[in-house]
Amino acid sequence: MQAHLSHQPCWSSLPSPSVREAASMYGTAVAIFLVILVAALRGSEPPESPFPYHIPLDPEGILELSWNVSYVQEIIHFQLQVQGLRAGVLFGMSDRGEMENADLIMLWTDGDRAYFADAWSDRKGQIHLDSQQDYQLLQAQRTRDGLSLLFKRPFVTCDPKDYVIEDDTVHLVYGILEEPFQSLEAINTSGLHTGLQRVQLLKSEVPTPSMPEDVQTMDIRAPDILIPDNETTYWCYITELPPRFPRHHIIMYEAIVTEGNEALVHHMEVFQCAAESEDFPQFNGPCDSKMKPDRLNYCRHVLAAWALGAKAFYYPKEAGVPFGGPGSSPFLRLEVHYHNPRKIQGRQDSSGIRLHYTATLRRYDAGIMELGLVYTPLMAIPPQETAFVLTGYCTDKCTQMALQDSGIHIFASQLHTHLTGRKVVTVLARDGQERKVVNRDNHYSPHFQEIRMLKKVVTVYPGDVLITSCTYNTENKTLATVGGFGILEEMCVNYVHYYPQTELELCKSAVDDGFLQKYFHMVNRFSSEEVCTCPQASVPQQFSSVPWNSFNRDMLKALYDYAPISMHCNKTSAVRFPGEWNLQPLPKITSTLEEPTPRCPIRQTQSPANPTVPITTEADAE
């Protein structure tokens, strides 16, 4: 049966392309009907289970993505909902969210017929048909508001034009076609309405613990604020626990997003303020506001973190996060990241995080430990670097002193850098050998931060070493980027969530200050430009005067790779464990882990050059 849309004649149902037309497109585009219920490719079945994960792709809510993961088959099923479809849509993935060199699926029309294909874009944004069709269309169905596409793709295709889907951050890209194109090669992404969204596609499948009967909830929400019409806003709000709130365990939390703002609320975090301060000033405004009290910088203890696409976070049945009671600050800071690239005005928001807690304390308190680098300008990244690595250590000496013989069990991790961070990894080493990766994100983005459950719990014993490395890109910088708290300064942190809680709250390092001063003296000696090494000059001032030639860059890398470190092996009171922690040698690692090589799927048959497309049609079900 054939149906027509008078207002969208280009999407009228038509027969599949001829062999000649298919050959001209290198033979793998699939003709589909978009006006009626359209059928699947022969032998393909949509997944039986529902789609557990959903995200809006664009701020207007035109495109919505749902997905389902099969770890056994190593396949993802995608469902793309398109509202008010015009002349087509593209969807895909790229290394950092660029439209160039992207792995894509294309749905487009030439004004007569409609086509679906696996494609890719070159470095100029030109679209090309992929000779290896790894995205398989399963169904295209007309909906009340537009179109629903169901398709699947393996995690790994071993196609050089395809993106390898791993369990780190994925930069999804999308585009909307406003007019027909006579061929796929006539499309360039530069002329399209495009955007990006970040998400973790491959999430850990952890069994959901049952909730106790006495579970209660507490909502930490923004107080009906007006979302600024800026592309990026970090909003801070200080709230307080009820008076004399006793000790409880947080055992689960989930996001509460104001209806209609799903595409604007990017990620949220709840921090507990430092217990040492009896009072914190009230604040409700942008986190970078000049009116923000400096004391809010001491609200850094993460209680909950959510990012777009994340589901509810459950703690292991053995443990819960303590809050309330003696020794715990009643002050909490909510931070909401709004992503508003269209600069939409007049949108009110009361989004936040719902804490589920119980007065029946679990066997263990869950703790949060900071790994990585100390927040100090001693650690810096030269300008114009594409992949500069800084590494922080939690040494065997610290874990030997601070951990019990039974060790601790890390079950979740939140990686953190500021704006120039591109990769983060934490590795556990034992007896001089790297043993396992705690958490890794090779496509890390500072604009997408969440607490991620580990696929397998990592146990850390006394004498183990935890090594956290961050890779930075400062191509657009003219001065060195130093470590610190400011958003234009840098961090390298892994907040690991573990049980049972210990006194060790911070296990981080920085290069020894005396050896850094030797570096500045050496730069003075071999450079025609003078670097101030006088006592009154701050480290940032010294770094700002370094001439960044290749020699000075290489020497700074060597300094960080070999110089002694100052260890911060700190208790919850911010006091170091007793011992000598300055001028400590770097841990000696004799064997390192190699990144696993993706396994290529076994291909039973190759797609024919000019496929015959089986199409079945049904009347519109509405």
Swiss-Prot record:
It is found in: Cytoplasmic vesicle, Secretory vesicle membrane; Cytoplasmic vesicle, Secretory vesicle, Chromaffin granule membrane. Disulfide bonds join C158-C600, C236-C287, C273-C299, C394-C507, C398-C569, C470-C492. Residues 61-177 form the DOMON domain. Pathway: Catecholamine biosynthesis; (R)-noradrenaline biosynthesis; (R)-noradrenaline from dopamine: step 1/1. Keywords: Catecholamine biosynthesis, Copper, Cytoplasmic vesicle, Disulfide bond, Glycoprotein, Membrane, Metal-binding, Monooxygenase, Oxidoreductase, Phosphoprotein, Signal-anchor, Transmembrane, Transmembrane helix, Vitamin C. It is an enzyme of class 1 (oxidoreductase). Homotetramer; composed of two disulfide-linked dimers. This is Dopamine beta-hydroxylase.
